[in-house]
Regions:
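Short, structured beta-strand-loop surface elements
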Residues: 55-110
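A generic local structural motif
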Residues: 7-11, 36-37, 58-60
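Short, basic/aromatic recognition patches
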Residues: 1-23
């Protein structure tokens, strides 16, 4: 279930995340989804997902964010070891283009995650 607040496990995961691509989803003027992989980080001061890449302010995703003011992002992967152990961190929220830094910032209006304990220090604590 989606929440608006980060859990303690999510905060630990964001403080030391595994190397993984993010996928940012936006919607164009016709309502057609647009999904693009890219680099990411988390700004703990503003509690925003920060999505970078090459010349971001001139991209289609930036155009969509400027028009709609919203976006979603997924960071996901598979836990190390045998078997199928997926993990994911999903955010939906208000988005804006930061032209000065050349990134897109997404506020956490809704957050959902699963399997993060398998790829964080909290895994040893049984979280």
């Amino acid at each position: 279930m989606a929440r608006s607040e980060l859990s303690a496990l999510e905060r630990r995961w964001l403080a030391d995340p595994p190397q993984a691509l993010a996928r940012i989803a936006t919607v164009d003027a016709d309502g057609m989804p647009h999904v693009v992989p890219g680099g990411w980080s988390f700004d703990p001061a503003t509690e925003e997902m920060v999505l970078g890449g090459r010349d971001v302010p001139r991209t289609q995703r930036a155009l969509h964010v400027r028009a709609s003011g919203h976006a979603a992002v997924v960071v996901d992967g598979l836990a190390p070891g045998p078997g199928w152990s997926p993990w994911a961190f999903v955010v939906r929220g208000r988005a804006r283009v930061d032209d000065d830094l050349g990134v897109i910032r997404i506020a956490i209006d809704q957050v959902t995650s699963w399997g993060l304990g398998s790829v964080t220090a909290g895994a040893a604590a049984g979280e």
